[in-house]
């Protein structure tokens, strides 16, 4: 199968961590024996003209490579670029929704109109969670719930002691970790407040953002800043509990990665995490209940460390398995077009 993959998030020289989850899926599709050509934006920022360039690149690739199917990641703008490419090549379009694309369409009439045009053109849609699929509302093509999964080799169990020695963090009581941008929607200040109420252990934030100053200088709190994606597993290995108590997470990739490394999690009950965080793997917390977060930290810290049950739950989302499921959707779209 010849696949043209179109995405607005892809690792590049400036931003090697951008869209790693899409890169991993493309890699596994190739391992399955499929040809995958990529038209992508590989850097953050820049002018909106980059989206027009993405569309032009996708159309040119479709004419040059003659794919069997176009696989776009994000409903818009990549979905729009993918739709144009699919029309030129006269092949089916499959589009995957990741979260921000759906929420953006719900907030903007212009984006909602553009997104409806993409979904009307698509032969099939893929959503990374059932919660997100429900947010799509009524759409014409079938929606398949398949997340991008986790690389079980990269996020494999490691001894905590070695990671703590390497990082110089995590030896004093339960070690809590948050990975992601320091934004209000991530509830990082609420997490720091809940940790202070708990009164023991250590808390590290891997990531940066506008709330950094509100977290700086707190007892027991370490601000590691942004680190390359390749270094994230060491931080997860050093922790006892990965915390992702956001207002909502359309999927919750960081929690899944921690579970794959046999670490328990505290995750938001809003969005995708309830679909893969089992009671044995972690604690779900209502983001509207501030007092519940301290209790959740204590409950998660009481789970086994390391936690084999967390790894077992994460293994259901092996990126190899998920890529094979996506390939089946693409193949069905091709077969339906030829019937």
Cite the ranges covered by each PLM segment:
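Carbohydrate-associated surface elements
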Residues: 131, 149
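A short helix/loop element that forms part of the nucleotide-sugar donor recognition site in Leloir-type
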Residues: 156-169, 307
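Conserved donor-binding/catalytic core segment of Leloir-type glycosyltransferases
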Residues: 170-186, 192-196
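Nucleotide-activated donor-binding/catalytic signature segment of Leloir-type glycosyltransferases, i.e.
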Residues: 213-230
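Conserved acidic donor-binding segment of nucleotide-sugar-dependent glycosyltransferases
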Residues: 226, 278-279, 283-290, 299-304
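Short alpha-helical donor nucleotide-sugar binding micro-motif in glycosyltransferases
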Residues: 226-227, 234-239
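Aromatic "clamp/platform" in nucleotide-sugar-dependent glycosyltransferases that forms part
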Residues: 247
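Short hydrophobic beta-strand element within catalytic cores of glycosyltransferases
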Residues: 264-267
């Amino acid at each position: 199968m010849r696949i043209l993959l179109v995405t607005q998030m892809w690792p590049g020289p400036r931003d090697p961590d951008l869209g790693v989850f899409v890169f991993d899926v493309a890699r596994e599709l190739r391992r399955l024996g499929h040809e995958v050509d990529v038209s992508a934006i590989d850097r953050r920022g820049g002018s909106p003209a980059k989206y027009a360039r993405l569309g032009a690149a996708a159309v040119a690739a479709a004419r040059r490579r003659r794919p069997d199917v176009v696989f776009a990641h994000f409903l818009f703008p990549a979905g729009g670029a993918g739709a144009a490419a699919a029309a030129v090549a006269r092949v089916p379009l499959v589009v995957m929704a990741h979260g921000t694309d759906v929420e953006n369409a719900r907030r903007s009439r212009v984006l909602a109109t553009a997104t409806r045009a993409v979904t009307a053109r698509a032969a099939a849609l893929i959503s990374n969670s059932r919660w997100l699929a429900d947010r799509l509302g009524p759409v014409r093509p079938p929606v398949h719930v398949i997340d991008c999964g986790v690389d079980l080799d990269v996020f494999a169990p490691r001894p905590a002691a070695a990671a703590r020695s390497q990082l110089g963090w995590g030896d004093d009581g339960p070690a809590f970790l948050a990975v992601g941008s320091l934004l209000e929607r991530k509830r990082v200040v609420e997490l720091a407040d809940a940790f202070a109420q708990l009164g023991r252990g250590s808390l590290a934030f891997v990531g940066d953002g506008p709330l950094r100053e509100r977290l700086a200088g707190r007892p027991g709190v370490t601000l590691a800043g942004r680190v390359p994606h390749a270094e994230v597993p060491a931080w997860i290995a050093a922790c006892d509990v990965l915390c992702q108590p956001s207002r909502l997470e359309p999927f919750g990739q960081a929690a899944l990665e921690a579970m794959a490394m046999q670490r328990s999690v505290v995750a938001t009950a809003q969005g995708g995490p309830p679909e893969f965080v089992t009671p044995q793997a972690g604690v779900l917390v209502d983001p509207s209940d501030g007092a519940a977060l301290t209790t959740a930290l204590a409950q998660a810290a009481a789970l086994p460390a390391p936690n084999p049950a967390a790894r077992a739950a994460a293994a259901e989302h092996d990126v190899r398995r998920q890529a094979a499921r996506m390939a089946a959707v693409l193949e069905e779209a091709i077969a339906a077009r030829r019937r």
